[in-house]
Amino acid sequence: MSEADSSSGFAGSVENGTFLELFPTSLSTSVDSSSGHLSNVYIYVSIFLSLLAFLLLLLIIALQRLKNIISSSSSYPEYPSDAGSSFTNLEVCSISSQRSTFSNLSS
């Protein structure tokens, strides 16, 4: 092959059985350093863990609000009952209207 093929980063040779050989270019060898690569991994891991902690915090806040909504709606009934009766206002009005209709029919 020619000199231009080896400077481009790959060279192929069909005669000796290899089709594609990769050679590092000058740009990739200057950028690829082990300490720089390791610091990039630390940055990505720290960003991931920060986002994970933030999402966990949002989930906890949402669950607390949901728990407060559920507990406030179940602990305070709209119409407190007298003498242990479990009738709602609608049921009481319905019963009283049926009684008045029955008394009008009977008289």
Curated annotation (Swiss-Prot):
It comes from Mus musculus. It is a single-pass membrane protein. GO terms for cellular component: intracellular membrane-bounded organelle; membrane. This is Serine-rich and transmembrane domain-containing protein 1. The chain crosses the membrane at residues 43-63. The keyword Transport does not apply. The gene is Sertm1. InterPro entries: SERTM (IPR031741). The keyword Acetylation does not apply. It is found in: Membrane. Its main location: membrane. Keywords: Membrane, Transmembrane, Transmembrane helix. It holds the Pfam family SRTM1. It comes from the Eukaryota.
